């Protein structure tokens, strides 16, 4: 089970949001590259970056910070990034810059042709982020709720060749209220590609519950507020996950 530290970028700083609200952000670091190194030193095997400004603007807005992280990480571990990725040129720029995976969210839902083209041009590098509330997909930095069901969309995207799905329960994100295990397992069981859990990780109990069901197709979990607030010791959690197989 991959425990993947999240580095959310707003105005060049590392922050955490509550339920995706840009007005409810807490700054955890002024130096994104140093934050990346901190998690690598703690045993991270992948990093999850989010360009929060970019997600709302529809274009990269924290490229300087992202570039500094990629330079710091080098070939140590893979890095994945979401937020503001709406065209093939942006994907190419990021992958050429050292990014392993790009995460397409809103654009996958609103512009499926773009996702198809991205999977065709950059096979193995495309992850789709599906953010949902009550089983329905949300877009535009979580500000708009669609009528699309998570499982139906994920199955379609799987057919197009996406590498994996990141499933975020918006109602729990940044709330330390526990991962929505049942919904994550249900999605993983409906797919043959891996699912990465996200939203609400609160502590070691969540890690143990996810590890217990990882054979259903759950590859990892995004670790956000819990590892910044001290509710979860990242190194200890990764060690526990390894111990559980």
Curated annotation (Swiss-Prot):
Which Pfam family name is an example for this entry? Answer: His_biosynth
Q: Where in the cell is it found?
A: Cytoplasm
Q: Which residues cross the membrane?
A: none
Q: What are the GO BP annotations of this UniProt entry?
A: L-histidine biosynthetic process; L-tryptophan biosynthetic process
- What does UniProt list as catalytic? 8, 131
The enzyme class is: isomerase
Q: Which family does it belong to?
A: Belongs to the HisA/HisF family.
Q: What is this protein called?
A: 1-(5-phosphoribosyl)-5-[(5-phosphoribosylamino)methylideneamino] imidazole-4-carboxamide isomerase
Q: Which organism is it from?
A: Verminephrobacter eiseniae (strain EF01-2)
């Amino acid at each position: 089970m991959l425990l993947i530290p999240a580095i959310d970028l707003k105005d060049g700083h590392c922050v955490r949001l509550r339920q995706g609200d840009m007005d409810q952000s807490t700054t955890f670091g002024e130096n994104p590259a140093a934050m990346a190194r901190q998690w690598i030193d703690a045993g991270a095997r992948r990093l999850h970056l989010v360009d929060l400004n970019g997600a709302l603007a529809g274009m990269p807005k924290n490229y300087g910070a992202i570039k500094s992280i990629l330079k710091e990480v080098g070939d140590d571990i893979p890095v994945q990034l979401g937020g503001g990725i709406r065209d093939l040129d942006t994907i190419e720029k990021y992958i050429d810059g050292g990014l392993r995976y790009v995460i397409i969210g809103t654009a996958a839902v609103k512009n499926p042709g773009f996702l198809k083209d991205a999977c065709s041009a950059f096979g193995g590098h495309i992850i789709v982020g599906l953010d949902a509330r009550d089983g329905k997909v949300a877009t535009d930095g979580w500000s708009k709720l669609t009528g699309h069901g998570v499982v139906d969309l994920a199955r379609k995207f799987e057919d197009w060749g996406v590498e994996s799905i990141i499933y975020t329960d918006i109602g729990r994100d940044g709330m330390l209220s526990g991962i929505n295990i049942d919904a994550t397992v249900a999605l993983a069981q409906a797919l043959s590609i891996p699912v990465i859990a996200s939203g609400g990780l609160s502590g070691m109990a969540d890690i143990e519950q996810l590890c217990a069901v990882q054979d259903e197709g759950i590859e990892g979990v995004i670790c956000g507020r819990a590892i910044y607030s001290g509710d979860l010791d990242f190194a200890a959690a990764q060690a526990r996950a390894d111990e559980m197989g």
